[in-house]
Each structure stands twice: as C-alpha cells, then as structure tokens.
Design a protein with these regions (language model features):
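Detector for methionine-enriched segments
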Residues: 1, 54-57, 103, 115
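Generic structural signal for short, solvent-exposed loop/turn connectors between secondary structure elements
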Residues: 1-2, 89
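Amphipathic alpha-helical segments
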Residues: 2-17
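Short, intrinsically disordered low-complexity segments
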Residues: 4, 29-31, 44, 63, ...
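Amphipathic, interaction-prone secondary-structure segments
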Residues: 13-68
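Mixed-charge, Lys/Arg-enriched low-complexity segments
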Residues: 66-129
Length: 129
C-alpha cells in the first residue's frame, strides 16, 4: 500500500518538530492504515489514510482556528483533504512528503471543509498567492 511506503520515507526524515503515530483506521479493518503527523511549531496535524491497496490515499491537514473559549470543547478546527491515486509510482513518494510539509507551512490556503481535492488542485492552491 502507498501509505506503508510513504511511512518508511517519513520515518527516515522526522525531526523534533514532527511527532509520528501509526495506527489502524477505524473503518478500514487493516493494520497500519492511518498515520498521524503532528507539526508542533505550526500547531497542525496531518492524517494520512489508505484503507485498501486499491483505494485512494487521503492526506488531511487539520489546524486549530481561533482560541479555545469557555464552553468551547477544544476550539474550532479547519481542514482540507487531498487525495492521491493508488497507482502513484513509488519514485514520487518523497515528493509527496515534501508536499505535505509545504501544505503545513501554507495551511491557511487549505481550509475550506469541502470535499477532498486532487493533488493537482492542491498544487494550484500552493502556487496561487
């Protein structure tokens, strides 16, 4: 699965800013079908999910928007999902990880709560000012 190959790349390149958790996604029934990255400096989480060999791999960037207030359980969150085809060639996986880091550093461009977008649409968001 793409997620397992991407996980190997991420493990080789994590630093003190990134915490890494590998787990089972509740809807997949497959082991290690979700990876959660927490970028401490940016206060942003990224969830990577692939539930089968033939399903798309989804990368969801999640960030807190606004501060927690009384009666507000955890604050307000914004997110955006980006999908990749399961046929993506392995040679592009290091670029996917770099893409994730770019998304985190430009998180404000990705919060719409809309349906998942393709990586091509996400690249367009990154390149638009």
């Amino acid at each position: 699965m793409l997620i397992h190959k991407l996980t190997k790349i991420i493990k080789q390149d994590t630093d003190d800013n990134i915490s890494f958790v590998e787990c089972d996604h509740p809807f997949s029934g497959r082991p290690r079908s979700q990876v959660i990255l927490t970028f401490k400096e940016q206060k942003t989480r990224v969830s990577i999910v692939q539930i089968s060999d033939m399903s798309k791999m989804y990368i969801c960037i999640i960030s807190r928007k606004g501060k927690k207030t009384d009666g507000d359980f955890g604050g307000h969150y914004e997110w955006q999902e980006v999908w990749f085809k399961p046929t993506l060639e392995d040679k592009y996986l290091p670029q996917v990880y770099q893409f994730i880091k770019l998304m985190v550093n430009n998180a404000n461009k990705f919060y719409s709560k809309s349906m998942a977008i393709s990586y091509k649409e996400a690249i367009a968001k990154l390149t638009n000012k």
